[in-house]
Design a protein with these regions (language model features):
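Single conserved hydrophobic/aromatic residue that forms the stacking wall/gate
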Residues: 1-11
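Active-site-proximal cap/loop segments of hydrolase catalytic domains
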Residues: 12-310, 314
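Generic recognition of flexible, low-complexity loop/linker segments
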Residues: 17-18, 28-29, 93-94, 233-237, ...
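Short, surface-exposed loop/turn motifs at beta-strand boundaries within globular domains
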Residues: 22-24, 34, 240, 338, ...
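Residue-level signal for short segments within beta-strands and strand-turn junctions
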Residues: 33, 45, 319-321, 412-416, ...
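Acidic/polar loop patches that form or flank catalytic/metal-binding clefts of enzymes
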Residues: 145, 173, 274, 303-318, ...
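Catalytic cores of secreted or luminal carbohydrate-active enzymes
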Residues: 293-310, 319-374
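Intrinsically disordered, low-complexity Ser/Thr/Gly-rich stretches
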Residues: 347-504
Length: 504
């Protein structure tokens, strides 16, 4: 078995953080999965004869620099080069930090990635069982104390939902940092609107070889546009998860916001915590204060240290405030907030307003989806300082003359007291969005609530000529502050595909 000792104060990459300790680096360690497939993992661990807890970071990007890297992200998403050592896999924990605190880091090339046998899976129960195999292999190593955690953001966070749902005996704690859980409703489609661009961009970045390959999720999406056995297997069974969990979310992520928060709400773990931050997923994950916070969680569960982690508030909440100072880490008991007051606003097409009372006059609003003006807007001026935190929905009656379907996008934004948008970083677009393909409007009455409509996505109901139908559009969670006389802007538009590379 090949290994090397990476020495203290050396740098793995130019300008990177010097290593704080000596590290034993074992490369391409073979791991046999339950079906005979062999995958390969890198192991970083302390140089001693003691047993240590391990942290697993599971993804198909490559166990070293791989096919994606922070340098590929504009301005490294605010993560300075000196904040990391360069030993970490993309979106994974930095071995330099964790080994110096007594942990081993397990960075596998999952099934099909690089030299690992098989084809890369786009999540699902088999992917989760692969993770279970890796967890149990790790726990059996003589350098491991039998306790394994999981960490990482985005794909590495989604992996944790699927692996934890398979109940590996030695999986002791998870820390999913911004990860969706439903591959159909949150990445292949939104509200039934197909979004193949990101899946294509993502799968092309996987570290597959000619001898391997990637599950063709995009082709399956085009062949199977409605919910079926295939897509149900791509939904993590959150309710079956009982592992202690530290979940991190944000309002500004275009694919992970809903899944991260729903993951926290729906897992059955009795010991679980949620933190909603106000930056980007990478900036937050590698922020030194948050790394220390995560270590306190892992120290408690993986090392058995009797620290004060359990005194941490169950929910720590950020509330965004464009044009002013955000609220950060406000302590709460739950999400959505128990003191939430839900309010209805009625659309008035005559003047484009949102009002407390329904208009006495009938009106309608329309747009041409093929023209440059493919949207309509409504606004309301805040009569007092207001916090909008939690879930929203939009109820509409719609028709599509001479067409049998519609793809709708809705967006909630804050405007200043002059009715102008705030200037914010492209990495921090402050808006809450929802989508709907009208032919997939059928509600799941068992899952839907007054605040959160939930579609079955199982039956296509095409529109008849000039038929008017009601639809309920779920708008993903948001936390935002309005000062008196600032505006809430609602935009309803025909959906237009974004550039794939703009979706993290």
């Amino acid at each position: 078995r090949w290994y090397e000792v990476t020495g203290v104060q050396t740098c793995a990459l130019p300008i990177s953080m010097p290593l704080p300790c000596d590290i034993k680096f074992e490369r391409d360690v073979p791991v046999k999965l339950r079906d005979g497939i062999t995958i390969y993992t890198d192991v970083f661990r302390p140089i001693d004869d003691h047993s240590h807890p391990a942290i697993l970071a599971m993804s198909p990007y490559g166990k070293e620099i791989g096919s994606q890297w922070l340098d590929d992200v504009p301005m490294r998403a605010g993560v300075p080069k000196k904040a990391t050592s360069g030993l970490q896999k993309f979106e994974g924990p930095d071995p330099a930090y964790w080994v110096s605190h007594g942990y081993a880091i397990i960075n596998p090339d999952v099934r099909g990635a690089y030299n690992s046998e098989g084809i890369i899976l786009f999540f699902g129960s088999d992917y989760g069982r692969d993770g279970r195999d890796i967890v149990e292999w790790t726990a059996q190593q003589d350098w491991c104390n039998g306790k394994v955690g999981m960490s990482g953001n985005s794909w590495l966070a989604i992996s944790q939902w699927f692996v934890a749902a398979e109940h590996p005996e030695h999986l002791t704690a998870i820390a999913p940092w911004e990860g969706l859980y439903d591959c159909y409703r949150e990445v292949a489609t939104r509200g039934g609107v197909m979004m193949p661009e990101f899946i294509k961009f993502l799968t092309e970045s996987f570290a597959s070889t000619e001898s391997g390959g990637v599950e063709d999720c995009m082709a399956t999406m085009l062949e199977n546009p409605t919910m079926n056995v295939y897509w149900r297997d791509k939904i993590a069974n959150l309710e079956s998860i009982i592992t202690p969990a530290y979940v991190v979310a944000s309002y500004t992520n275009p694919i992970h916001t809903n899944g991260s928060i729903e993951g926290y709400r729906r897992i059955s773990s009795k010991e679980k915590w949620l933190r909603i931050h106000n930056t980007s997923e990478w900036d937050d994950y590698y922020n030194s204060a948050h790394v220390e916070d995560l270590r306190k969680f892992f120290d408690h569960y993986l090392m058995g240290i009797d620290n004060d982690w359990k005194e941490t508030a169950k929910v720590r909440l950020s509330v965004l405030n464009p044009g002013n100072k955000d609220i950060i880490d406000r302590e709460e008991e739950d999400f959505p907030l128990q003191r939430t007051h839900y309010k209805r606003l009625f659309l008035n097409a005559a003047d484009g307003s949102l009002n407390d009372e329904i208009s006495k006059n009938d009106s309608n609003h329309g747009y041409d989806s093929d023209s440059s003006k493919r949207s309509v807007t409504y606004r309301t001026r805040m009569k007092e300082d207001t916090e909008l935190t939690g879930y929203m929905k939009l109820h509409l009656w719609v028709q599509a003359p001479e067409h049998d379907d519609m793809d709708i996008e809705v967006k909630i934004e804050k405007l200043n007291c002059l009715g102008k948008k705030f200037l914010v970083s492209p990495m921090k677009a402050v808006s809450a969005k929802g989508y709907m393909r009208v032919s997939l409007r059928e509600l799941d009455l068992e899952r839907s609530t007054e605040q959160q409509p939930y579609q079955t996505m199982a039956h296509i109901q095409k529109l008849k000529d000039r038929e008017i139908v009601p639809i309920d559009i779920s708008i993903w969670p948001m936390g935002i502050l309005f000062k008196k006389n600032e505006y809430l802007l609602l935009t309803i538009s025909a959906y237009k595909s974004p550039p794939a590379e703009s979706i993290p």
